[in-house]
Amino acid sequence: ETMLSFDSGMIGFPLRLLAREVYDKVIKKIGTDKVALITGEEKIIPTNAKYFLCTVESMPIDKNLDFVGVDEIQMCADHERGHIFTDRLLNIRGNKLTMFMGSSTIKNIISKLNDDIEFINRNRLSKLTYSGHKKISRINRKTAIIAFSAEEVYAIAELIRRQKGGAAIVMGSL
């Protein structure tokens, strides 16, 4: 919403699926001719694109845009991808507004970059709760299951597919 209030803008996301999800929402609002999607796997760049939804790694750094946002900026601390997030933190700016979204764990570092910084805390839009250990057969639709290894993710997904008929997998290191 904030990006669309400007004449042009770009947001970098940590996950390509998130960039795609937001792209789909934005094109429903304003159409496909002004919105670009740039990830490692997809490049949809209309000639007259004014808005760019990208993975952080795929953000074009040569664009002159009113708004620039980077989601999950605390990923600067990640040992694998942190250098990209840090580069965006230090080098990419919107002409009118730059917004870094994410955890307050990086607030102290960001506050040293510029005196004219405003920090805004927003409540989570959806509620995330721990429901304890449950049998797969008793989970509700649209339940998120968190696992901590790729092997465990695929094993749980296969079990859900067999018992419930389907599962979606999203993996990342946030």
Go through each PLM region and give its residues.
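Post-Walker A helix-loop "phosphate-sensing" segment adjacent to the P-loop in P-loop NTPases
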Residues: 4-13, 30-34
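Post-DEXD/H (motif II) to motif III coupling segment of the RecA-like Helicase ATP-binding lobe
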Residues: 67-70, 74-135
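Conserved RecA-like helicase motor-core motifs
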Residues: 30-41, 120, 163-174
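Walker A/P-loop NTP-binding motif
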Residues: 1-8, 25-27, 136
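Residues immediately C-terminal
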Residues: 18, 58-59, 74-76
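Inter-Walker segment of RecA-like/P-loop motor cores
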Residues: 27-64
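Conserved strand-helix element at the start of the C-terminal RecA-like helicase core
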Residues: 7-22, 98-101, 138-171
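Loop/turn-to-beta-strand initiation segments
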Residues: 8, 48-51, 64-67, 73, ...
